[in-house]
Curated annotation (Swiss-Prot):
Annotated positions for site Important for receptor turnover: D217
Source species: Rattus norvegicus
Record lineage: Eukaryota, Metazoa, Chordata, Craniata, Vertebrata
GO terms for biological process, alphabetical: antibody-dependent cellular cytotoxicity; calcium-mediated signaling; cell surface receptor signaling pathway; cellular response to lipopolysaccharide; dendritic cell antigen processing and presentation; Fc receptor-mediated immune complex endocytosis; Fc-gamma receptor signaling pathway; macrophage activation
SMART domains noted in UniProt: IG (SM00409), IGc2 (SM00408)
PTM description: N-glycosylated.
Subunit structure: Forms a heterooligomeric complex with ITAM-containing signaling subunits FCER1G. Interacts (via transmembrane domain) with signaling subunits; this interaction is a prerequisite for receptor complex expression on the cell surface and intracellular signal transduction. Binds the Fc region of antigen-complexed IgG.
Protein's recorded name: Low affinity immunoglobulin gamma Fc region receptor III-A
């Protein structure tokens, strides 16, 4: 009965489609700062699954396809025009989530690896100078108040972020004979999200389809049962009539 095999076929099709949707490419920055200065070198690396026949990578900058097919996209000398959202895709990977890169033209820049952190995340901030010019007497400030001082330029590290670490940050230091300050950067700390609280869309769809297929199977089962019972009721065993032959005299 082909209609009994239909739910199984649908289940296999849905399962393969959902499995394919689980793979998504990932864009990583090297170095991992999301804010850089002009003339900095930035490498964007696409992590995904390739096919034996096609090892090319599709890169997108602000939704426009880039004529570059290597897994690593190198920006040798960044310019402000290179700012924007970057995404990548491979043969066996879905389009990645966007990664924002900001390129600034300035003497001093406060760098960060993220703009939004969760409670408990480590935070790294760096007071970066144009062309890596030496910077001395570096002060990191939060909401206008000094947070950390370094005689020689060093990163500001916070091992576990709390809501108290939210706020407006900037850094200042001595370059040559000039006291220079960076532009301010807003750092936000959110509550940690629980992965088990919300299912991804493909898992929700899969669960709904499983329930639908179960309902179809149940309806078909009882429908077949009723059909069989009706067939048995209609069919009646023929009655045999025996007659006694007259005996020969």
């Amino acid at each position: 009965m082909w209609y009994l095999l239909l739910p199984t076929a649908l289940l296999l099709t849905v399962s393969s489609g959902v499995g394919a949707g689980l793979q998504k490419a990932v864009v990583n920055l090297d170095p991992e700062w999301v804010r850089v200065l002009e003339e900095d070198c930035v490498i964007l690396r696409c992590q995904g699954t390739f096919s034996p026949e096609d090892n090319s990578t599709k890169w997108f900058h602000n939704k426009s396809l880039i004529s570059h097919q290597d897994a690593n996209y190198v920006i040798q000398s960044a310019r402000v025009k290179d700012s924007g959202m970057y995404r990548c895709q491979t043969a066996f990977s879905a389009l990645s989530d966007p990664v924002q890169l900001d390129v600034h033209a300035d003497w001093l820049l406060l760098q960060t690896t993220k703009r939004l952190f969760q409670e408990g995340d480590p935070i790294r901030l760096r007071c970066h100078s144009w062309r890596n010019t030496p910077v001395f007497k570096v002060t990191y400030l939060q909401n206008g108040k000094g947070k950390k001082y370094f005689h020689r330029n060093s990163e500001l590290s916070i091992s576990k972020a709390t809501h108290a670490d939210s706020g407006s940050y900037f850094c200042r230091g001595i370059i040559g004979r000039n006291n220079i300050s960076s532009a301010s950067l807003q750092i936000s700390i959110g509550d940690p999200t629980s992965p088990s609280s919300f299912l991804p869309w493909h898992q929700i769809t899969f669960c709904l389809l499983i329930g639908l297929l179960f309902a179809i199977d149940t309806v078909l089962y009882f429908s077949v049962q009723r059909s069989l019972q009706s067939s048995v009721a209609v069919y009646e065993e023929p009655k045999l009539h025996w007659s006694k032959e007259p005996q020969d005299k």
